UniProtKB/Swiss-Prot annotation:
Provenance organism: Syntrophomonas wolfei subsp. wolfei (strain DSM 2245B / Goettingen)
Function, in words: Probably functions as a manganese efflux pump.
Protein name, entry field: Putative manganese efflux pump MntP
GO cellular component, one term: plasma membrane
Membrane topology note: Multi-pass membrane protein
Subcellular location(s) per record: Cell membrane
KW Manganese (keyword) present: yes
Record InterPro entries: Mntp/YtaF, Put_MntP
Parts of the chain that traverse the membrane: 4-24, 39-59, 64-84, 120-140, 145-165, 175-195
Protein family per UniProt: Belongs to the MntP (TC 9.B.29) family.
GO molecular function ontology, one term from the record: manganese ion transmembrane transporter activity
Superkingdom: Bacteria
Length: 195
């Protein structure tokens, strides 16, 4: 029983690595605490639901959904990564603002393209799709499925939270260069998803 539990925890950690990396990249960019909470909750729920869905869908449907969902997630990451690179590069260049623009920027009221539930769901799916394929093997474990997927969800959510916290700390240390670093991380993740 202990060996099976250790196996499930290790599997959950591996499945949560994409969420950790993505959250760290977004943490470098700097996102609102409300967004972090929504993302962590979404990733946790998806890491519970996706294995259950995979268990019920079967291998053929899982392959079809896995390929397209991963590609869509990769496109979202390319867009966000490119946006972060552009913004980071622009921030290290000297800029002039009128009073209204400076006030908005200093107040942190610039709109983020990450704020919508649609983007949260797409990004959550992009890092949870591996859990769908893991669902096909859940029946072979000698552990109750509900406990297994709850462990996966809890660990993935925790790893997302750690990623945001780590990204925030690195962002404070590196300043505007964190935007560029975050963009590179997201582009690398997009390439990993496609390959």
């Amino acid at each position: 029983m202990i060996e099976i539990l250790i196996t499930i925890i290790l599997l959950a950690i591996v499945l949560g690595m994409d969420a950790l990396s993505l959250a760290m990249g977004m943490g470098l960019r700097g996102v609102a605490k409300d967004y972090e909470k929504k993302f962590v909750l979404t990733v946790g729920i998806l890491h519970v639901l996706m294995p259950l869905l995979g268990l019920n869908l079967g291998l053929v449907a899982g392959r079809f959904l896995g390929v397209w969902a991963t590609r869509l997630g990769a496109l979202v990451l390319v867009y966000l990564g490119w946006q972060m690179l552009s913004k980071g590069y622009a921030e290290i260049q000297p800029q002039r603002y009128n009073f209204a623009e400076a006030k908005t920027i200093l107040a942190g009221k610039q709109q983020s393209t990450l704020d919508s539930w649609t983007s949260i769901l797409l990004l959550g799916l992009s890092v949870s799709i591996d859990a769908l394929t893991v669902g096909f093997t859940l029946g072979t474990l000698k552990m109750p499925i509900l406990i297994t997927v709850l462990i996966m969800g809890l660990i993935a959510a925790s790893m997302s939270w750690v990623g945001f916290a780590g990204g925030r700390v690195l962002g404070r240390l590196t300043g505007s260069y964190a935007q560029i670093l975050g963009g590179v991380v997201l582009l690398a993740l997009a390439i990993k998803f496609v390959v």
